[in-house]
């Protein structure tokens, strides 16, 4: 990421006197960029003060193996911050990118009948996969930088 934030969640809520976090998951990477300002306006109107962000965003953060792009995420975080909406940044590992499944099909889960479950839904990976763990940790480290 290009910008360091000066606050730590949840101190933003308690220090501002706004109390409990109110909001939900926000997935702006799944919608056209033009909806961002309207989404934020409606969040402010509804009293939203916190969103969980980047839950399903691995493929947007790392569109190709080893190529990371955080500009869009920085932009969204900055816009939310300007509206006093705190961000609970997710690990972005709920859904892995297609390139990971194509290179490492062994990360796909196997159902109770021994059938490989295809990619395309949330958490369609084996939690015990050392390959998945390696890639997920790399992503999380980059997010933390």
Predicted segments, located by residue:
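An acidic-aromatic substrate-binding cleft motif
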Residues: 2-37, 41-49
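Aromatic-lined substrate-binding rim segments of carbohydrate-active enzymes
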Residues: 11, 37-112, 141-144
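Residue-level signal for the start and early helices of compact helical domains
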Residues: 3-4, 11-13, 17-18, 22, ...
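The substrate-binding groove and active-site-proximal loops of carbohydrate-active enzymes
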Residues: 21-33, 54-73, 116-138, 144
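Structural motif
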Residues: 16, 43, 127, 144-145
